[in-house]
Amino acid sequence: MMLEPRPAARTLLFRVAERVYGCDIDSVREIIPYRRATRLPGAPPWVQGLINLRGTIVTVLDLGMRLDPARAPVRDGSIIMATQGTRVVGVAVDEVMDVQSIVAESIDTRADVGPQGLVSGLGHLHDGVVVLVSIHVLVTQVLL
């Protein structure tokens, strides 16, 4: 009996510093050019602040600073508008690269890296390893 292969995950690839990350494309609503956010007093350093996106106030997070607090904040690049239910959160990244399918068998979910389950696994592509980020966990951390 032959097992059917699991479907490939469509993944948005993006760069933060020198590392390539990815997230499930289904959690991405849109991508906009980077814009400066209004800082929130008392917010953690990885929360850049708020922007007004066509009349909707959106919290913008700095993924690089969330993963490495010593890193300089993103000041250029793009903001990935990610959705979790009815919530929209912006994720500031240095560069949005591509959308690729990652075969489920090439994803290692045992990877224990990143803060509080933020990294959901490592995906293996022909030209390297992609750190897969859980948008659900990232958004949940903001809501707490």
What are these regions (language model features)?
Residues 1-144:
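An acidic, low-aromatic, low-complexity terminal/linker signal
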